[in-house]
Regions:
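Short, basic, glycine/proline-bearing loop/turn elements
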Residues: 68-84
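Acidic, metal-coordinating catalytic cores used for nucleic-acid/nucleotide bond scission
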Residues: 10-11, 79-90, 112-115
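Metal-dependent nucleic-acid phosphoesterase active-site entry motif
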Residues: 1-18
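Acidic, metal-binding active-site segment of PIN/NYN-like and related structure-specific nucleases
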Residues: 91-125
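Amphipathic coiled-coil/heptad-repeat helices and related helical stalk/stem segments
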Residues: 16, 90-91
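Short, surface-exposed acidic-centric catalytic microdomains
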Residues: 35-73
């Protein structure tokens, strides 16, 4: 099972965050995270007025509780920070945590700030969420489609079909993944 670390920008919109976490719940991949990542996510989500500070803190607390096994403690990567290459100190934290967390893929919309050749020396590939999810769907179609079905079945406000959920992911920016998932679901009972 692949270990992945996501940049903060992958954790919203919530449909994309939910998918990344659900893939971990169903053991399709392991989402590795750090306290720094969640703190940055809270700051951004509150600044963008998508959640209140207490609501964002509650979501982070739930991630800490339910995904505790995939946390990379600061002490495991702080010694790597000075070695990381990149213009943004927050991104250097993410790169160092990814290296210490032995991830295979660092997923980000901001490919320019994560030097692929540098991270490859540590065995880490950099991919955007659409490319990563397409690759995962190609390698594990039954599992990924199962996650989408389970997620849709759990949606209550508003209720969603699997196709509705795929549409939300399409609007979240993972258009190639959404198209591929829709094609695979075509003709199936969703």
């Amino acid at each position: 099972m692949a270990r992945v670390f996501v940049d903060t920008n992958v954790l919203f919109p919530f449909s994309l965050m939910d998918l990344m976490l659900a893939l971990t719940e169903d053991a399709v991949h392991t989402l590795v995270w750090s306290d720094h990542l969640l703190a940055e996510w809270e700051r951004v989500i509150v600044r963008e007025r998508q959640r209140s500070a207490p609501a964002a803190a509650g979501i982070s607390a739930a991630i800490r509780e339910f995904f505790a096994d995939s946390r990379v403690p600061d002490d495991d990567y702080k010694h790597l920070l000075a070695q990381m290459e990149g213009p943004d100190p927050d991104d250097c934290h993410h790169m160092a945590a990814a290296v210490a967390g032995r991830v295979r893929v660092l997923v980000t919309w901001n490919l320019a700030d994560f030097p692929a050749a540098f991270l490859a020396r540590y065995g880490v590939t950099v991919a955007d969420p659409d490319a990563y999810l397409c690759s995962l769907l190609s390698r594990s179609p039954r599992e990924v489609l199962g996650v989408l079905r389970r997620m849709a079945a759990g949606k209550r406000r508003p209720p969603m079909t699997t196709i509705d959920l795929v549409g939300a992911l399409d609007r979240a920016g993972v258009t190639l993944f959404a198209r591929s998932a829709r094609d695979r679901l075509d003709g199936l009972s969703v």
